[in-house]
Structure formats: structure tokens, C-alpha cells
């Protein structure tokens, strides 16, 4: 009978010592991994706190909102239309396209551009509609713009090519404005003054032209008839000026004597 071989104790001791040697290394690696996770969590928490702080602070909101280019339209109307409130509106909620669309819907504004500078400073530059007429009597001075907008305003020296409107109430001025915007600029520039002539003809108008002629016509026929004015005067006797009445037909009566 064979004798039982003794266990190889030295080899087992070496294995145990090897595992004991590796345990500190494994522990160190686990500790480093846990530290990295903790750092990532702390960074994430810090970022979240920073975002919350930023959103709650004034740094995330519109710092200034300036409007340039206004002449007749009030800046307050433009700012209100933009829906931007300084120190209240968050900058990331500001859509340039939407803001400009709302501003260009303001009566009297033809177009607008917007630029943004550092730290949420905004500036909007507007181009107003051209002034095409000026009403100088009661209930107060008013300016008529090319889009038909009627706004309070004082006489301006630069209105050289715009007619003066006299004797119009708010209602009659609105009716005239709807027709006035349909007049070609080259014809409109020939009108010196338009007077409400309601005393003789309801809705009637008396126009004093820059060439010396006077035109009588109704508001309803204003735009259609007056756009033919150049053709009408070309058919008049050369060198003659007078009163042109447009009422179904066209009638010319020269002034008596020299005007």
C-alpha cells in the first residue's frame, strides 16, 4: 500500500501571500474609483447650483433694450409690442424673429433690425413709414404715414412734398387717408393742400396743386381720378390754369384774369 503524499504547503502559502499583497492594491483602486465618482457627483451638483443661481440672477435676463430710429412713433409703443421687459425677461426666451415681427406690426413701422451685444444688451433700429400728409387744424396736428397710420404730430419742415390737410374731422381724415395712400407718389407730390369742402358737396374735396390748378372732386373718386391728373393737365390749353371739376366727367374752367 502506497503511502499518502504530503500536501504541498509551500505553494499554498505563496498563493495566500500573493492575495494578501493584492488586497491593498485592490482597496486602493476601489478607493480611487469611489473618489472619482464623488468628484463627478460634486461637479454635477455644483453645475446644477450654478445654473439655478444663473437663472435666478440678473445675469440671465435682458440688461437693456434700446430703440433707435423713431421720429413719429413712440418708443414706448415699440417696447410694449416687443414684449421684452428689462431685468425680467430671460435672455434665452428672446426670439429675434418673433420680436421683430411684433415690432413691424406696430402702425407706422416699415421695418426693424435688432442686434445683441455682450451680457444681454439689445438694440432695435426701426425705419418708419414715410410721411405723406399733414393735418394742421383741430382736433390737433396729425401726421399721415404711408401705411395709413394717423398719429399726433407737429409740422415738420421736411414735409416739402406732402400736402397739408385742412378742415378734416377724425372720421373724414380716416376716409381720406384710405384714398391718399393709393395715390402714386409722383401725383401726391403735386398736391399742395387738400381742404374739406363739405359745405358744398358732402365728402367733397378741394385740392390746391403745385402747378396752380384747383381740383374739385369727392373722396370716393379721389384715388381713381387723381392718378389720371397728369393726363388731364396734358390735355389742357397750354399755359392755362384754372379749376378742374371731376364729377362723372372732367370739366375745366380757367381762372379769370392772371393767377
Curated annotation (Swiss-Prot):
It comes from the Bacteria. One of its GO terms (biological process) is FtsZ-dependent cytokinesis. Residues 60-259 are extracellular. Pfam families: FtsQ_DivIB_C, POTRA_1. Its main location: membrane. Keywords: Cell cycle, Cell division, Cell membrane, Membrane, Transmembrane, Transmembrane helix. Residues 60-129 form the POTRA domain. It is a single-pass type II membrane protein. The keyword ATP-binding does not apply. Cell division protein that may be involved in stabilizing or promoting the assembly of the division complex. Belongs to the FtsQ/DivIB family. DivIB subfamily. HAMAP family: DivIB (MF_00912). This is Cell division protein DivIB.
Amino acid at each position: 500500500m502506497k503511502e499518502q503524499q504530503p500536501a504541498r504547503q509551500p505553494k499554498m502559502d505563496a498563493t495566500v501571500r500573493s492575495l494578501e499583497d493584492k488586497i491593498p492594491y485592490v482597496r486602493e483602486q476601489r478607493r480611487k474609483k469611489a473618489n472619482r465618482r464623488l468628484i463627478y457627483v460634486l461637479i454635477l451638483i455644483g453645475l446644477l447650483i450654478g445654473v439655478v443661481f444663473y437663472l435666478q440672477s440678473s445675469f440671465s435676463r435682458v440688461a437693456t433694450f434700446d430703440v433707435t430710429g423713431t421720429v413719429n412713433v413712440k418708443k414706448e409703443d415699440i417696447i410694449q409690442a416687443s414684449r421684452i421687459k428689462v431685468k425680467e425677461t430671460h435672455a434665452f426666451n428672446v426670439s429675434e424673429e418673433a420680436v421683430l415681427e411684433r415690432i413691424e406690426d406696430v402702425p407706422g413701422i416699415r421695418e426693424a433690425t435688432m442686434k445683441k451685444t455682450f451680457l444681454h444688451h439689445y438694440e432695435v433700429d426701426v425705419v418708419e413709414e414715410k410721411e405723406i400728409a399733414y393735418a394742421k387744424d383741430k382736433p390737433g396736428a396729425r401726421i399721415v404715414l404711408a401705411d395709413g397710420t394717423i398719429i399726433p404730430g407737429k409740422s415738420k419742415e421736411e414735409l416739402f412734398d406732402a400736402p397739408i390737410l385742412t378742415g378734416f374731422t377724425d372720421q373724414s381724415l380716416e376716409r381720406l387717408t384710405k384714398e391718399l395712400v393709393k395715390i402714386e407718389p409722383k401725383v401726391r407730390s403735386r398736391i399742395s393742400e387738400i381742404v374739406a369742402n363739405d359745405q358744398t358737396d358732402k365728402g367733397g374735396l378741394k385740392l390746391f396743386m403745385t402747378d396752380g390748378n384747383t381740383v374739385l372732386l369727392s373722396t370716393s373718386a379721389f384715388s381713381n381720378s387723381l392718378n389720371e391728373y397728369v393726363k388731364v393737365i396734358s390735355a389742357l390749353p397750354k399755359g392755362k390754369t384754372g379749376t378742374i371739376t371731376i364729377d362723372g366727367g372732367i370739366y375745366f374752367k380757367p381762372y379769370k384774369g392772371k393767377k
